[in-house]
């Protein structure tokens, strides 16, 4: 095993635990160290945290805490939903942000669920026609909501809105101020525990982004560690539930988390076919992403070179 002197120092960003569980497990189980890495996890406010204010979910995505941290060099690598990373890689540099390339399809395949207010009378997706669904704009809950509802509604019938963090959304549902909202864990389990109806749910894959300062061998070592962590989580998720339920601050115990929703896989190269399919889908909605990007301009699978 490498000694402390030989370990390469890496700073990674983590916000919502369910999307970065493989990173947290790899750190705490010593898997990064086994790969010669000294990984520092930098926590940023996420929409799943009870004590997060609305700055983490503001509509101006490049002003959110994660973006500010990355732009100032606080971290060199982060993960978002696949569509969010495409948007960051394409639009970020156009907006004068620190450049970031897509470097992998990530480990987390997080579940998102559309949950209805008990007062709404909504029990099926078709009833969400022209009804605003609360999401984090331009993040996984937004894109996955569009994907899910496309099977039941026309694009022009799908409406989304920003109603704050997931805790704030749940309380707005409870008060009847919203008809529906989209959540990831632990908030899907919290909603189930409290009797809210779940309309539909789907997995949503993360993608990994990195600055040019992160070299291929370092990324490869990170991804090997995360692949091993994914195996451990899938084999026995219970011991790791606490990372996720901590964000709910007492509203959900680790044994109450619906761990069957957790799914992780080894990071893999981001293929041309995957990029083209994802990018073309995003271009089908106004203002989701800027046209004109190419696979060569936004993807760098340097970890596999």
Which residue ranges define each predicted feature?
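Residues within well-ordered alpha-helices
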Residues: 22, 28, 66, 168-169, ...
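Pocket-lining segment of extracytoplasmic ligand-binding domains
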Residues: 83, 160-161, 165-247
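Secondary-structure end/capping motifs
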Residues: 216-289
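Short, glycine-/small- and polar/acidic-enriched structural segments
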Residues: 2-153, 179, 199
């Amino acid at each position: 095993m490498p000694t402390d002197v030989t370990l390469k120092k890496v700073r990674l960003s983590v916000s919502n635990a369910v999307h970065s569980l493989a990173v947290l497990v790899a750190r705490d189980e010593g898997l990064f160290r086994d790969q010669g890495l000294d990984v520092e996890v930098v926590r940023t406010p996420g929409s799943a945290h009870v004590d997060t204010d609305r700055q983490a979910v503001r509509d101006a995505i490049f002003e959110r805490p994660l973006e500010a941290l990355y732009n100032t060099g606080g971290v060199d690598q982060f993960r978002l939903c696949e569509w969010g990373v495409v948007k960051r890689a394409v639009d970020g540099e156009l907006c004068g942000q620190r450049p970031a390339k897509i470097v992998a399809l990530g480990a987390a395949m997080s579940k998102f669920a559309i949950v209805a207010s008990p007062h709404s009378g909504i029990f099926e997706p078709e009833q969400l026609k022209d009804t605003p669904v609360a999401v984090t704009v331009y993040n996984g809950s937004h894109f996955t909501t569009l994907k899910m509802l496309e099977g039941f509604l026309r694009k022009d019938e799908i409406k989304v809105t920003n109603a704050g963090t997931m805790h704030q959304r749940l309380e707005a549902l409870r008060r009847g101020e919203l008809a529906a909202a989209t959540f990831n864990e632990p908030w899907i389990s919290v909603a189930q525990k409290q009797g809210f109806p779940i309309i539909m749910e789907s997995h949503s894959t993360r993608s990994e982004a990195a600055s040019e300062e992160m070299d291929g061998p370092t990324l490869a070592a990170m991804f090997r560690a995360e692949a091993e962590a994914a195996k451990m989580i899938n084999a026995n998720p219970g011991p790791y539930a606490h990372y996720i339920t901590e964000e709910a601050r007492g509203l959900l115990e680790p044994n109450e988390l619906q761990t069957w929703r957790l799914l992780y896989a080894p990071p893999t190269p981001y293929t041309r076919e995957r990029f083209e399919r994802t990018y073309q889908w995003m271009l089908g909605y106004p203002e989701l992403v800027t046209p004109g990007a190419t696979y060569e301009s936004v993807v760098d699978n340097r970890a596999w070179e």
